[in-house]
């Protein structure tokens, strides 16, 4: 199984918000970014062994204002696109209980057994 999470995390360290792999426990510490792997499948085989892997990651930008989520999302999109990922989904949500805005985005890529991303 291919794990690109460390590579993605290393490219997101320069952002203006902490990147987490779990949902915020404290919604007073916003903005933040949540990164989760949502798919990791064998896309193609060669000589009976996995050759291409399809990976999908969901990134959520959380903030107290919609404008903050959009600004973070633009930076995230730039970073993930530079890595070779394609955005497949984007949606704005509002959590009334926490009064927090979030933008959910999904990114997909194909990579080989050497973790080289292709399109």
For the regions a protein language model found, what residue spans apply to each?
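Short, solvent-exposed beta-strand/turn "edge" segments of beta-rich domains on protein surfaces
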Residues: 46-51, 96-98
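Small/polar-rich, solvent-exposed N-terminal microdomains that initiate assembly or binding
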Residues: 1-49, 72
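Oligomerization/assembly interface segments of phage tail-like spikes and tubes
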Residues: 51-64, 101-112
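Mid-chain, well-packed structural core segment of small domains
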Residues: 53, 58-85
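Residues that cap or initiate secondary-structure elements
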Residues: 27, 39-41, 65-67, 111-115
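Acidic-leaning, charged glycine-interspersed low-complexity segments
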Residues: 74-119
